[in-house]
């Protein structure tokens, strides 16, 4: 909470490997907030597409797949527990093939719009640290605090190596480069910092340093802001 006691909506965006998940999880614990990882929802949909042999390129079919699936996020101290149709797929969605699939399903505007509505429902009550790629620009454009994390490419590759099972440095470097291009150039919610976001390069910062910096930004919010619209910009 800020000084007024209001539960804030804190948006943390950035590319793969910038440290979003680790930072958001640690920050949420310190604040007593929920931590919601929007990317896990795309990973769950990608996994469902893999399991049902669905094409990543068919927008309409993917949208129907999303609508017919039960994708749930359960906040935990170390991140989110991801449930797909009642099954815990938290580990499976971290594997390389699912990560690559998530990047492909997320480019479709209709899929993103459906996901955005679900994500707004999850965070609308405040008291949430929500991380992803378009939280501050699309999901909650009027979030109380907006952070955009970035890091040097080699640092991001090293971090992803610690997260993804069955991946190599060379494969991850290529994947990150391709994903950056896809994320930044997509028509629906491209990956860009919100105009009012604080941009932090985490390349040479520890997790504690980044969390402390964000806590200072939150503390500088001197008074409660009225609950804002969740309409996209």
Predicted segment positions?
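Hydrophobic positions on the alpha1 helix immediately C-terminal to the Walker A/P-loop
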Residues: 23
């Amino acid at each position: 909470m800020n000084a007024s006691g209001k539960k804030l909506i804190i948006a943390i965006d950035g590319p793969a490997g910038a440290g979003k998940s680790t930072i958001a999880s640690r920050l949420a614990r310190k604040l007593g907030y929920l931590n919601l990882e929007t990317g896990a929802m795309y990973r769950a949909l990608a996994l469902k597409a893999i399991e049902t042999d669905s094409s990543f390129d068919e927008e309409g079919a993917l949208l129907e797949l999303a609508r017919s699936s039960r994708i749930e996020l359960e906040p935990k101290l170390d991140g989110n527990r991801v449930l797909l149709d009642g099954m815990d797929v938290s580990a499976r969605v971290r594997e390389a093939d699912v990560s690559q699939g998530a990047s492909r399903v997320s480019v479709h505007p209709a899929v993103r719009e459906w996901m955005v509505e679900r994500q707004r429902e999850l965070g609308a009550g405040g008291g949430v640290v929500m991380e992803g790629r378009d939280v501050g620009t699309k999901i909650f454009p009027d979030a109380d605090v907006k952070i955009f994390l970035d890091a040097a490419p080699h640092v991001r590759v090293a971090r992803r190596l610690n997260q993804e099972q069955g991946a190599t440095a060379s494969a991850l470097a290529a994947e990150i480069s391709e994903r950056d291009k896809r994320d930044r150039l997509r028509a629906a919610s491209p990956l860009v910092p919100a105009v009012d976001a604080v941009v932090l390069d985490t390349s040479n910062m520890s997790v504690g340093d980044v969390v402390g910096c964000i806590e200072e930004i939150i503390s500088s919010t001197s008074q409660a802001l009225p609950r804002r619209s969740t309409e996209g910009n």
